[in-house]
Swiss-Prot record:
Pfam families: Alpha-amylase, Alpha-amylase_C, CBM_48, GlgB_N. CDD domains: AmyAc_Glg_BE, E_set_GBE_prok_N. It is an enzyme of class 2 (transferase). This is 1,4-alpha-glucan branching enzyme GlgB. The lineage of its organism: Bacteria, Bacillati, Cyanobacteriota, Cyanophyceae, Synechococcales. It comes from Synechococcus sp. (strain CC9902). It catalyses: Transfers a segment of a (1->4)-alpha-D-glucan chain to a primary hydroxy group in a similar glucan chain. Belongs to the glycosyl hydrolase 13 family. GlgB subfamily. The active site is at residues 431, 484. InterPro entries: A-amylase/branching_C, Branching_enzy, GlgB, GlgB_N, GlgB_N_E_set_prok, Glyco_hydro_13_cat_dom, Glyco_hydro_13_N, Glyco_hydro_b. Keywords: Carbohydrate metabolism, Glycogen biosynthesis, Glycogen metabolism, Glycosyltransferase, Transferase.
Length: 764
């Protein structure tokens, strides 16, 4: 190529670089071989002078082709270890040349697996990575934007001017750039220019940290370096059946559990105060707690209550507090509202040290339309379906992932592995699964597209959920994967190789609705609705169910649990205690939302915090004691959890006494052969001499009674237990003559060590 042609070519390249329209800067910039040896070309917008520092040499560059392309000749390949002295705006700096590093970060196998949708650790390639190339430290930026005309990195490193750092386009729609000299804490975004020339500034989809709202830039963060101390917990978790244990979950929203004063900032380990993150305006002067403060306050509280797990409503980064976290923009980052990624790791580590598992809500069903997020990412519908009839939740104002695209599924499946690997979480609850499974979910006729078979099922989402659960249990066999699925979709908790969705637990939404409908009734009318309280047993073994009284039931005018109950305050408290006790003795794992454990009165409001002052009142303290003791009883009695998903674990004694609204049943443990007798009276009328059949004669100790005085009850009961009578009823030859307190549930345990003679002898 002649000199004039080269000159013309370089002028065109300079114009393309200046206008952010060059997708292959490494073809022009950095060390380039030529007839005389090597030419180093440097792209340095608005610089007045650039000097090439090569060993002891200082070579002044020239700008023969474009005022921002600085060139210098060398007889041999300078490699990547040279530096540049840059004079710009009266300031002189020295730096390495980003375009001296030609290393391809995303390898051929990485691209192949990603294109297949099977790169389970794709975050180790995508995003912003602190690394070294040729001994030089910096950050490798890697982005997937296959339809973009160009992509650039902008941020603190270049005064937010996308012209400075154009990225190199690789195969498979990957863009890369190594920027030497950057460190953790650098703010950045990607500037993406569409084929039509429109410019979009996007946060990193694989960003590992983001700014505190309302700002939304990504932040360079270290993935490695935290020193975990939970190895024994992790080994034990993955060596056992995840369901063969008591599971009692405290569901909570970190930002509205309790607030602190903005006048009392958290003091960091370096002795400096952390800038407070304001809470919402319901409490002027309030700030959010940090992950570190939650470690000191929340974990001891949950441990004292006896819960086995904490479930965190979404802690992935999200811009709007009012979404409760369910409109995610930062999938690979814990929200910065409460601190740094390492501080969240320390929170999980501390939970494990105290014997508490951590479950997070995971939201792969939709994402928001925020301009800095995934929507219309590279000027096309990259992550979402283009047709709103399948790509948009109009009622929620959000977009739906295109599960048919391999790279999109890979983004989500790898995200699941990421949270377990990077943050040692123990489980997920997948939100709004029904919205994923049905194409006509919340859509009128004419506003949804049928599947390839003409049906309403979203077969793409089904395959995605199956893949996600298969991969999760392949990597973490002891994990919990919980579906919030509100329909009768079959085999939700069956393994994927049997055609199921692959979850190992499903929220029992039918039980929840039936229970709340029943307990909201005036007790006199409950006799006509006995089916509400008993129906769940007829289907409870069709799935692995978790009983949940969640946040969804205490918002939007539904009232909190206590205020759903009829009657005066005494009856409200008693009904609440009876419902919670029935929940704990019914087959299935347990979840309740924060505030229910002490009888919160007001609806949950994300802008406020819980009514902790209620614990100054004995009835609320009594409900808290009840929940504490329910968890103690639950964990101490394998009959209440070991056979949750086996019909052996439950046996009705009598479910037909609707006239008295009384039920009785046994919970049984196949391993030890032990059992418990549970009797519940769901009216305010107490019953003396109420007879219940039992399988063996002997003494039955009363081990739990919701009407105990310490819980706020009337303290009616059975004097510690009752011996059997040889009076047959309910198909048994022996029975107990019981006192049933009002609005109560009582639990008895057969004591084979106490004879009938001992139990009937007068006490001293």
């Amino acid at each position: 190529m002649g000199g004039a042609a080269v000159l013309d070519w370089m002028v065109q390249d300079g114009v393309r670089l200046e206008n952010c329209r060059h997708d292959h800067p490494l073809a022009v910039l950095g060390p380039q071989p030529d007839d005389q040896g090597w030419t180093v070309r440097v792209w340095m917008p608005e610089a007045q002078k650039v000097t090439l520092l090569l060993g002891s040499q200082e070579i002044v560059t020239s700008t023969p082709n474009h005022p921002w392309i600085f060139e210098a000749s060398t007889p041999s390949d300078p490699g990547s270890n040279y530096k540049l002295r840059v004079e710009r705006g009266g300031i002189t700096t020295e730096q390495h040349d980003p375009w001296a590093f030609r290393h391809e970060w995303m390898g051929e196998m990485d691209r192949h697996l990603f294109a297949e949708g099977n790169h389970h650790h794709i975050w180790q390639r995508m995003g912003a990575h602190l690394t070294q190339i040729d001994g030089i430290s910096g950050v490798m930026f890697c982005l997937w934007a296959p339809n973009a005309l160009t992509a650039s990195v902008l941020g603190d490193l270049n005064s937010w001017d996308g012209r400075h750092h154009p990225m190199q386009k690789r195969l498979g729609g990957i863009w890369e750039l190594f920027v030497p000299g950057l460190d953790a804490g650098t703010l950045y975004k990607y500037e993406i220019r569409s084929q039509e020339g429109h410019c979009y500034q996007k946060a990193d989809p694989y960003g590992f940290q983001h700014e505190v709202r309302p700002d939304n830039s990504s932040v360079v963060a270290r993935l490695e370096g935290y020193s975990w101390s939970d190895s024994s917990w992790m080994q034990d978790r993955d060596s056992r059946n995840a369901l063969d244990q008591p599971i009692s979950v405290y569901e909570m929203h970190i930002g509205s559990w309790i607030h602190a004063s903005a006048d009392e900032p958290w003091i960091q380990p370096d002795g400096q105060p952390r800038a407070p993150v304001p809470a919402a305006d319901m409490k002027p002067g309030a700030r959010l707690l940090t992950y570190a403060e939650l470690s000191d306050r929340l974990i001891p509280y949950v441990k004292e209550r006896g819960f086995t797990h904490i479930e965190l409503m979404p802690i992935t980064e999200h811009p709007f507090d009012g979404s409760w976290g369910y409109q995610v923009t930062g999938w690979y980052a814990p929200t910065s509202r409460y601190g740094t990624p390492d501080e969240f790791r320390a929170f999980v580590d501390r939970c494990h040290a105290e014997g508490i598992g951590v479950i997070i809500d995971w939201v792969p069903g939709h994402f928001p339309k925020d301009a800095h997020g995934l929507a219309f990412f590279d000027g096309t519908h990259l992550y979402e379906h283009g047709d709103p009839r399948i790509g948009e939740h109009k009622e929620w104002g959000t977009l739906i992932f295109n599960y048919s695209r391999n790279e999109v599924r890979n983004f989500l499946v790898a995200n699941l592995v990421f949270w377990f690997e990077q943050f040692h979480i123990d489980g997920i609850r997948v939100d709004a699964v029904a919205s994923m499974l049905y194409r006509d979910y919340l859509r009128p006729d004419g506003e949804w597209l049928p599947n390839e078979n003409g049906g309403r099922e979203n077969t793409e989402a089904v395959r995605f959920l199956q893949q996600a659960n298969h991969v999760l249990f392949q990597h973490y066999p002891g994990a919990l994967s919980i579906a919030e699925e509100s329909t009768t979709w079959p085999m939700v908790t069956q393994p994927t190789d049997m055609g199921g969705l692959g979850f190992n637990l499903k929220w029992n939404m039918g039980w929840m609705h039936d229970m709340l409908d029943y307990f909201e009734l005036d007790p006199w009318f409950r006799q006509f609705h006995q089916n509400n309280i008993t129906f769940s047993i007829w289907y409870t073994y069709t799935e692995n169910f978790m009983l949940a009284l969640s946040h969804d039931e205490v918002v939007h005018g539904k009232s909190h649990l206590l205020h759903k109950m009829p009657g005066d305050d005494w009856q409200k408290y008693a009904n609440t205690r009876a419902l919670l006790a029935y929940m704990w003795t019914h087959p299935g794992k347990k979840t309740i939302f924060m505030g229910m454990e002490f009888g919160q009165r007001a609806e949950w409001n994300v802008w406020g915090d819980l009514e902790w002052d209620l614990l100054n009142y004995e009835p609320h303290k009594g409900i808290q004691r009840l929940v504490d003791d329910l968890n103690v009883l639950y964990k101490a009695q394998p009959a209440l959890w070991r056979d949750d998903f086996d019909q052996f674990g439950f046996q009705w004694i009598d479910c037909n006494d609707n006239r008295h609204s009384v039920i009785s049943f046994m919970r049984r443990d196949s391993a030890s052969g032990t059992w418990l007798v549970v009797v519940a009276n769901f009216t305010p009328q107490s019953h003396a001499n109420y007879r219940v059949g039992v399988p063996l004669e002997g003494f039955y100790e009363e081990i739990f009674n919701t009407d105990a005085a310490k819980y706020g009850g009337s303290n009616l009961g059975n004097m510690g237990g009752k011996p059997t009578d040889a009076c047959g009823i309910h198909g048994y030859e022996h029975s107990l003559d019981l006192c049933l307190p009002p609005l109560s549930l009582v639990v008895f345990q057969h004591d084979p060590k106490r004879t009938l003679i001992e139990s009937s002898a007068p006490s001293d």
